[in-house]
Swiss-Prot record:
The keyword Transport does not apply. InterPro entries: HtpX_protease (IPR050083), Pept_M48_protease_HtpX (IPR022919), Peptidase_M48 (IPR001915). The gene is htpX. This is Protease HtpX homolog. The active site is at E167.
């Protein structure tokens, strides 16, 4: 097994772990609401009976159904969600392309040939004044890479190729699944927790139901921090891997370093917070300027790249 195959395998394990974690949290929230619903006197006994189906866990089953439906819907529509909010154009090779569009497509084909990859992501240009890029798609067959028009205009050929190589590495490592699962399911989970607290309380007097209510209140407070930590752990790891993947494909770490520096300087000199408010897409961007970003700092990414022996 090659180094990149190991990375892909590790990311698959992480993806499954993330999905399992969310399913467990969904189930736990559902079980707590079921305890309140049946007005249980003993929390432990009630949880055992619900988990062994001695009492049917109605709310828990609804939670699992919601989780399943959300995942399926997101798989089918994730690319359109990522592209929403801005004017974007597909680089369609069956039509006449501009010189810049031709250049981007040629760079992608070069990388695919050099890496011996047998799939071709769709290429999109997003009409935006900020410099950024992202990849999307559940797997290689429905993948895409999107670059902003500002990025295309301000980077040189090698820097553009390095950015495309970075996004291509995300696709190779199955990182997009992590972005999808963590970004969207985090929001759904928080909504479920809030919904449970405000709509399933009722006037319960038994101790088990009251304890379940207290746990739900605590979860409502800590879940935002838990999901943020989970996003940061997974996303920062995959950004380092994608940077290394770009350097590996380019046989040179300098173009990726220059691209990161230019993008970082662009965000330092301009305020783009009010322009792009797609939170799902921001988690997948090559660069994220927020203080509590899921991405590692540019300084740390450049230091990591400089340690990369080509």
């Amino acid at each position: 097994m090659t180094n990149f195959e190991k990375i892909i395998a590790q990311n698959r394990i992480k993806t499954n772990a993330v999905l399992a974690t969310y399913c467990v949290i969904f189930a736990f929230i559902g079980l707590l609401v079921d305890v309140i619903r049946i007005n249980a006197n003993d929390l432990g006994i009630a949880l055992f009976k619900l988990m062994t189906f001695q009492i049917f866990p109605t709310i828990t089953m609804i939670m699992f159904l919601v989780a399943f439906v959300v995942i399926v819907v997101c798989i089918q529509n994730f690319s359109s969600i990522m592209l929403s909010g801005d004017g974007y154009k597909l680089i369609d090779t069956s039509k006449v392309l501009s010189s810049k569009e031709n250049q981007i497509h040629r760079l992608l084909l070069e990388l695919l040939e050099e890496a011996n990859l047998h799939f071709e992501p769709k290429l999109y240009i997003i009409n935006a004044p900020y410099m950024n890029a992202f990849a999307s798609g559940w797997n290689e067959s429905n993948s895409l890479i999107a670059l902003t028009s500002a990025l295309i205009e301000r980077l040189d050929r090698d820097e553009l190729k390095a950015v495309i190589a970075h996004e291509l590495s995300h696709i190779r490592h199955n990182d997009i699944r992590l972005t999808m699962c963590v970004g969207i399911l985090s929001n759904i989970m928080l909504l479920v927790a809030n919904f449970s607290v405000y709509f399933f309380m009722g006037n319960r007097k038994n101790s088990g139901a009251n304890l379940a209510r207290m746990i739900l209140w605590v979860l409502q407070i800590i879940l935002p921090f838990l999901t943020l930590l989970l996003q940061m752990y997974l996303s920062r790891t995959r950004e380092y891997m994608a940077d290394s993947g770009a350097a590996f494909l380019m046989h040179d770490n300098k173009p990726m370093i220059r691209a990161l520096q230019k993008i970082s300087n662009d965000y330092t000199n301009n305020d783009y917070k009010e322009i792009d408010k797609n939170s799902t897409r921001s988690a997948a961007y090559l660069f994220n300027a927020e203080m509590f970003s899921t991405h590692p700092s540019i300084k740390n990414r450049i230091q990591s790249l400089r340690k990369r022996v080509i």
